[in-house]
Amino acid sequence: MYRFGLFLTFLAASLSASAQSSDLQQRIKGFQSELAATYAVKTLNLQGESLGALEKEEPAYQTHFKLEAKEKSEDNLGRSTKLNAHIRVFEFETLDDLNWAMKRWMPDFIDHNVVKPGRDAKTLPHADPSIVVIDGTTITVLTLPCSQFELERFRTWRKQLTTYFGGASSVVIEVQGCEGPLLWTKNAPDPKDRTWK
C-alpha cells in the first residue's frame, strides 16, 4: 500500500511538472510566432551575455535561443547589421527552488556583478542591456548587444517579454543601457526581505 501511495505521489508531481513545462513551451512558441515576420529563431552556436551563477543552476526546464532580425539595420556604431536578442528561460520545479536560485544569483548576477535585491544601481560594469522577468517558478532573461541598444526598442522588448512571460505579480529587473543603470522596475522586493539574500 505504501509503495502504491508513493507511486501516486510521484505520478502527480510528474504530471504537474509536465503541465508547467507545456504551458511555458506554448508561451515561448507564442512569443516566437509574434516576432516571426521580422526575426528568425536561432538555436545553434549561441554565446550571449554571461548570466553568472544562474547558468550553473539545474532547473526542471531551460532553453536558450537567439532572435535575429531578417533585415539589416544600422547599430549605434553606424554599422549595417542584423539586430539580435538572446533569450534564456529557466523554469524551476518549485518556488523554493527558484528562491534558492535567486539567492545564489544575486551575488553573481549578469557578468558576475553583485546585485542587492530591491536596490537599484547606477552602474553594472561590463553588463549589456538586459531584461529579467521573474514570474512564479520561471526566470526569463533577454540580453541585447551594447552596440544595438536603443531605448524605444528596449521598451518594446520589455512589453513583449512581460506579455508572454510575466503577470501582475512578476518582478522585472532592467539593465537600461550599456553597463547600467540597473533598475527594479516592477514589484521590487523589500530590501529588508531575506528571501533572496
Report the location of each language-model feature.
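Positively charged n-region of N-terminal signal peptides that target proteins for export
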Residues: 1-4
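Soluble, non-membrane globular domain cores that form compact, hydrophobic packing
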Residues: 6-9, 17-86, 91-197
